[in-house]
Amino acid sequence: MTNSVRASALALASILLTGVSLGNANAADQQVQRGKYIVSIISCTDCHTPGTFLGKPDMARYLGGSDVGFEVPGLGVFYGSNLTPDKDTGLGNWTKAQIATAITTGHTPDGRILAPPMPVQSFKNLTKSDALAIAAYLKSLPPVVNKVPGPFGPTQKPTSFVYQVIPADKYVPTPPPPGK
């Protein structure tokens, strides 16, 4: 093989390998953008960004954990956790697969069950691709150091009762006023 043919082959191989690398980067960017879109439409900000429930979301701590708790009768008070990749107060030690599993099953990597305000029942039918896209987006965020309070209450390991926020025997519907 002549030097010019060898140089041409080497140049072509470099171009092709760069293309593969760029293709992988583009696919990763698309996955992150898909995750950003899904996080937006399912309103993760509502429960996981400080100040949102007070009408002033603190975007400097975007998805860094809530400062407003949710009381679940009989179980206690729970706060939206820090979803950023901070290793001490967020999801920094979780893999994308572990995040996707938690979103769709309600189980954390250490076996705990996510707090009842987390709408796992709504997310259990997400495709694996969409759950991993959410995880990729969360891992792409800047880490926010924010340890949320709690949980507080009689138990830290909710049982199957978790989705019954108001027990059926305690719920009394209020009829509409006459004429409405």
What are these regions (language model features)?
Residues 21-27:
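Sec/Tat signal peptide C-region and signal peptidase I cleavage site
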Residues 36-42:
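Local sequence-structure signature of Cys/Sec-based thiol-disulfide redox active-site neighborhoods
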Residues 88-97, 101-107, 120-123, 135-137:
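A structural feature that tracks compact, well-ordered secondary-structure segments
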Residues 30, 41, 49-78, 109-180:
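Flexible coil segments in periplasmic/lumen-exposed cytochrome c-class electron-transfer proteins
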Residues 1-12:
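Bacterial N-terminal signal peptides that target proteins for export
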Residues 46:
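Short, cysteine/histidine-rich loop/knuckle motifs that typically chelate Zn2+
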Residues 28-35:
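Short, intrinsically disordered, charge-biased short linear motifs at domain edges
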